[in-house]
């Protein structure tokens, strides 16, 4: 695995259980113990063994990996080596099994022969693709998943107990430094609440952050990565000319841009070519899921067959289900020949716009949804990507406003227990304005989990190449934590994040954040905003001038609170200064856009150029979905 520059921050305040740390004689141990007793997010206590993993900053242990390690097994071992050295000063050698003395003491990472001999062999049924086992046997310890992705995740869990390791952002990683460390008596099986967990935003451009947050790259889950609306790449209308008599019936009559809006999923000839082309793309696939992706628009085919299906089932989804069942049947046959000894490839299709409604009926007697007929039940290996793009994300899916969303989810769960979910946590029209999903995130995640969701993609602003304004770093952290363990206390997660990420300015920044959460609730509950991703929130009736000015004055207080670092730690000061400045961006954007007339021409021009300078310094590159921030400079009349 190619290594990237790592920016580390030493622990500012230890808040985790003292049982996870042995041999660190300082006040933070006691303080951490007291604080932990008051918290809900408490880790299990793991007793120490008699064995010294590190003593006086040195170790007799080494890290054992398989003779032929996978990329992720090697990466996991390197991460373990790195952070143990950072925390203790001891650099454990990494040794392949064919080169190592397995009679010595070791930390085994991945599918080693030693782990098999020790009986550490987690099955898929036990830990799925992302879970793992941590097991101490005598003076050795085994870190192992069913997959190497699970093994990668196991290292961060192990570190969290051994040295209180935690990551809040790519440049905010904390741990407790100690020169003496006992080996802990691990006997844990860890399975995430959601098997596959993904976002975009920072994780698009920083693989290392994704791994350390125990998230998944899209490419780890889905064959085509982020190319999810991919039907026209499988049956290309320029190759199979949609204007010709031979192929025109393969596509919908409606045109979007310069090509058909959708494929005609009831056309059997098209389906055979689709299957033939798709199977070619499966060769050598690393991911185990392929998305049968409709195009990204609201249109659907209205040919006689498709229209008749909609008339019968009340939704266009029935045509898609029958098409996808046939594709999955063909993929299953292909798996038997081409995926022997490997995880079989499964398909998912979109429940999105025209296909979001499941073909089900409601049985009042049983209080459950049922398929209209057996032909619309998804076969075992087929799944659905439930993407409620028209939902309100200001309220949970269980509220009256989102009654249709909950009904749709329950309906799909009546057809399959293999649901992948795509939810939305950003504004398409104004990327720079806070999208507050903190109030509903946990409840929505739990509802999805309770109804068969095994994969979740909670979409944020994927085009922004750096952490976004509008509290996006806090959002990314909490999303990561709740996807892994949906039972965690959100307030404690936020308190922990702010205390580390904003350091001495934590209290003020948290106050600004919570005030904006309340203000956003006012916008949604009292002023009529729907909470949808396409909302236009850049309206004067939503934002009062006094509120914006008050928030900006609070940021000045936060800048003052980090002055303690200006001379003593200039690098930390710069880091905190930029983090605070990033959060000012959305307020300044709204103020300039809506209340520019409150200032003289000269004052407004200076405000715009100061904004531009900070935005460029921070690396912000877009301000709306698909719209470069350079367009904003043009609109503002600045260069």
Regions found by a protein language model. Name each.
Residues 68-71, 76-79, 83, 124-314, ...:
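Feature activates predominantly on carbohydrate-active enzymes
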Residues 262-272, 280, 400-507, 511, ...:
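Structured mid-domain segments that build the active-site/substrate or prosthetic-cofactor binding neighborhood
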Residues 347-388, 432-437, 467-475:
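Substrate-binding cleft/loops of secretory-pathway carbohydrate-active enzymes
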Residues 25-133, 179-187:
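Acidic, contiguous N-terminal accessory segments
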Residues 324-361, 419-426, 456-459:
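Aromatic-lined carbohydrate-recognition surfaces of secreted/lumenal glycan-active proteins
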Residues 1-11:
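Bacterial N-terminal signal peptides that target proteins for export
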Residues 481-639:
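Catalytic domains of carbohydrate-active enzymes that cleave complex glycans
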Residues 19-23:
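C-terminal motif of bacterial Sec signal peptides marking the signal peptidase cleavage site
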